[in-house]
């Protein structure tokens, strides 16, 4: 069928002319059915499996390629599944002889899919033959509207296989899927970075191929995906050269359009095959440039063979991305906790357990708000894996079609704030729980949270605290806060208690955000056993700026506060300063916490507390008796102290 034939001729284009020519299809130099070009490209004629252009050397995908020599029936609309590649997406490209060239492996690359319908772009050539310098697979041409060229084939393993060309970016389509790995030849060049898809989804920037194991150059870091979803920049694995170790290229950050953040590639640790140079510390993962940026995962510093691993730079805070701070698990680039740049242990692993990348920008409020409005106890699923499916979150929102319009159903993001306590979208779940990683002790976590799941029903609706109101235990998170305070308090040793034990002084703490206050409150409780702290509550509104109407006296704002009762004024001052100093070093909501000292002329008579009986007989006692005591109603003035 002449080379030029439209390829619809009787032959199903499967290379029938050469089919038999040998399992590799090496036969077909020359004509080799041009038919292919429309194979998976939109027009469904299942013609040639292979996008070969007229003389494309291998007619890409020629020959039986299904090793059994059997031709498959002609119309094979899908490119998937055939054993042999037949080009649909050009997968089989290159089976044919390379022009006149090496048999078998060395097929030429399918010269990209024609600019025809959105077809599979030309397949990547399977790299040059193992000859001295097999050419690199040509870059897959970009399908005009179509899929992107699957990146250049891997360069042949020849003496210096060229690098696979970068995948062309699909003009409107998917992105080029990254350059092939450079051949393992003497000095395989680095695979070119995958081109970013121009529009549409961004290319996952190709990981730069690992440099050949020869004098390998480091793989160039994957290019950043262009706008669109951000491509995760591939981390170039440095070639383990005989000589210097390639420093892993830092993964390019996906330039987030509105994209998710590119996870900064972890810099590869230079391997240093012979312990050549020490691997330069892994480059820090590039920050995800924020669109609604996710947190760039701080690159794990590679352990160089001597050079200290570079610290993963914290993912840059995108607009709303989490990043902040260097790796490690603390407040570092590790888990984006979301909400404006405060990185952090959040839900944990790199960018991980917590926002599950989904919409990390307000990850906390969103995805989790959903989780909660959902009415099933599971605010963050305990196990990372469960998230996507079990949490039901994504799937479970849509089904009830337009529901959001009728009325704020818990799940609908729009109504987050109704559910979740205020425009800043923090769920009303215990703020403690909010950003805690899976808490270690149920001491306070939402009693219904994941950990409650086993307990049948919710024990009592959400208790921010575990056992009795307000007996929160300790756990690593609050311990850290407490530790910070203890250090600051250690600066001055002053009396914290008095003989009379009257609560005459106080520290009034407010502002920041509910969550930051809650955490600080739990921290103070651990650091200063001598104090007594009220639950978190809300401030009323103050004055309206203009002459207009003023708020009612009872009108609550969403700004929270709590009061710390103390027995000495001097310690109140010390504690105030400590809190101020602790808070100012922290990121956003926290640094806005304000503190002021109060003094109570006659002291506040806090109701007496009788420790519960040991046998547990009267374990309710502590509640019980202060109830009977009548105390709490009227501050228990009946002769407390």
From Swiss-Prot:
It holds the Pfam family EBV-NA1. Residues 452-607 are annotated as: DBD/DD. Residues 1-14, 51-62, 84-124, 168-352 have a biased composition (Gly residues). InterPro entries: E2/EBNA1_C_sf, EBNA1_DNA-bd, EBNA1_DNA-bd_sf. The modification Phosphoserine is found at residues 385, 393. Residues 41-50, 458-470 have a biased composition (Basic residues). It comes from the Viruses. Residues 387-395 are annotated as: Interaction with host CSNK2B. Residues 358-381 have a biased composition (Basic and acidic residues). Belongs to the herpesviridae EBNA1 family. The N-terminus contains the region UR1 that binds zinc and is essential for EBNA1 to activate transcription. This domain dimerizes upon coordinating. The Gly-Gly-Ala repeat region (GAr) inhibits the mRNA translation of EBNA1 in cis and thus prevents MHC-I restricted presentation of EBNA1 epitopes to the host cytotoxic T cells. The chromosome-tethering regions contain Gly-Arg (GR) repeats that function as AT hooks and are involved in EBNA1 stable replication and partition of episomes. The C-terminus DNA binding and dimerization domain (DBD/DD) is required for the viral latent DNA replication. This is Epstein-Barr nuclear antigen 1. It comes from Epstein-Barr virus (strain GD1). The lineage of its organism: Viruses, Duplodnaviria, Heunggongvirae, Peploviricota, Herviviricetes. The gene is EBNA1.
């Amino acid at each position: 069928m002449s080379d030029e034939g439209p390829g619809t001729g009787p032959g199903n284009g499967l290379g029938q002319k050469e089919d038999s020519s040998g399992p590799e299809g090496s036969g077909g130099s020359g004509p080799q059915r041009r038919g292919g070009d429309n194979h998976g490209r939109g027009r469904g004629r299942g013609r040639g499996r292979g996008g070969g252009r007229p003389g494309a050397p291998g007619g890409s995908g020629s020959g039986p390629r299904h090793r059994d020599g059997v031709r498959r029936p002609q119309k094979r609309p899908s490119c998937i599944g055939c054993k042999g590649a037949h080009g649909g997406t050009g997968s089989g490209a290159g089976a044919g002889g390379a022009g006149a060239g090496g048999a078998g492996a060395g097929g030429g690359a399918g010269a990209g899919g024609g600019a025809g319908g959105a077809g599979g772009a030309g397949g990547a050539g399977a790299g040059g033959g193992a000859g001295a310098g097999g050419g690199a697979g040509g870059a897959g041409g970009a399908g005009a509207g179509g899929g992107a060229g699957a990146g250049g084939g891997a360069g042949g393993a020849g003496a210096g296989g060229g690098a696979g060309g970068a995948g062309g970016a699909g003009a409107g389509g998917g992105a080029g899927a990254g350059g092939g790995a450079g051949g393992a030849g003497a000095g395989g060049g680095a695979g070119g970075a995958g081109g970013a898809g121009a529009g549409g989804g961004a290319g996952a920037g190709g990981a730069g191929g690992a440099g050949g194991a020869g004098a390998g150059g480091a793989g160039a870091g994957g290019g950043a995906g262009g706008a669109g979803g951000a491509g995760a920049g591939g981390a170039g694995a440095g070639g383990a050269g005989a000589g210097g170790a390639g420093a892993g290229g830092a993964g390019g950050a996906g330039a987030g359009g509105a994209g998710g953040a590119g996870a900064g590639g972890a810099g590869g640790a230079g391997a240093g095959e012979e312990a050549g140079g020490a691997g330069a510390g892994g480059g820090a993962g590039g920050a995800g440039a924020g669109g609604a940026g996710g947190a760039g995962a701080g690159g794990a510093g590679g352990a160089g063979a001597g050079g200290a691993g570079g610290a993963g730079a914290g993912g840059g805070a995108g607009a709303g991305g989490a990043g902040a701070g260097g790796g490690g698990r603390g407040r570092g680039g590790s888990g984006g906790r979301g909400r404006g740049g405060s990185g952090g242990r959040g839900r944990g692993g790199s960018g991980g357990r917590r926002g599950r990348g989904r919409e990390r920008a307000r990850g906390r409020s969103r995805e989790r708000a959903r989780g909660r409005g959902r009415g099933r106890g599971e605010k963050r699923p305990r196990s990372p894996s469960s998230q996507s499916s079990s949490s039901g979150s994504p799937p479970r929102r849509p089904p009830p079609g337009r529901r959001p319009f009728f009325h704020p159903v818990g799940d609908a993001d729009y109504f987050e704030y109704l559910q979740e306590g205020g425009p800043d979208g923090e769920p009303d779940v215990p703020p403690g729980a909010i950003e805690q990683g899976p808490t270690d002790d149920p001491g306070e976590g939402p009693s219904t949270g994941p950990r409650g799941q086993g307990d049948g029903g919710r024990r009592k609706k959400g208790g921010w605290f575990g056992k009795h109101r307000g007996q929160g235990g300790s756990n690593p998170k609050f311990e850290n806060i407490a530790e910070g305070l203890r250090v600051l308090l250690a600066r001055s040793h002053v009396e914290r208690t008095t003989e009379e034990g009257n609560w005459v002084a106080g520290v009034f703490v407010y502002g920041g955000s509910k969550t930051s206050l809650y955490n600080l409150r739990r921290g103070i409780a651990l650091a200063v056993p001598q104090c007594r702290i009220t639950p978190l509550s809300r401030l009323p509104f103050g004055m309206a700026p203009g002459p207009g109407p003023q708020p009612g006296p009872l009108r609550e704002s969403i700004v929270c506060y709590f009061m710390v009762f103390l027995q000495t004024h001097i310690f109140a001052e010390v504690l105030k300063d400590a809190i101020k100093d602790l808070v100012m070093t922290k990121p956003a909501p926290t640094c806005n916490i304000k503190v002021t000292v109060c003094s109570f002329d006659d002291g506040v008579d806090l109701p007496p507390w009788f420790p519960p009986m040991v046998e547990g007989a009267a374990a309710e006692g502590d509640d019980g008796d202060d109830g009977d005591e009548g105390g709490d109603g009227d501050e228990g003035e009946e002769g407390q102290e």
